[in-house]
């Protein structure tokens, strides 16, 4: 089933190529959506795809790039809207 997930990743996740790594992994998995840095030093991701694939993507987000130090991943599930055509860095 196609789902939508809203993620907020906290820790040392800005300035460590986290967004670029997330985009690369999302494209590899065929996930659509976006990733952006937030003013509170977190990273936010809105992603859509098959639920099992999103679970794998979330597991990657728990680790991030080799330079990242992820402390927490907040997860909010929702219904897919089909609004995204690719995966972008905002």
Name each region found by the language model.
Residues 1-90:
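Intrinsically disordered, low-complexity, mixed-charge
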């Amino acid at each position: 089933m196609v789902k939508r997930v809203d993620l907020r990743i906290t820790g040392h996740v800005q300035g460590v190529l986290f967004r670029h790594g997330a985009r690369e992994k999302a494209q590899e998995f065929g996930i659509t959506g976006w990733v952006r840095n937030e003013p509170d030093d977190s990273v936010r991701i809105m992603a859509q795809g098959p639920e099992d694939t999103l679970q794998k993507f979330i597991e990657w987000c728990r680790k991030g790039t080799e330079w990242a130090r992820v402390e927490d991943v907040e997860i909010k599930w929702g219904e897919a809207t089909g609004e995204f055509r690719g995966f972008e860095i905002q």
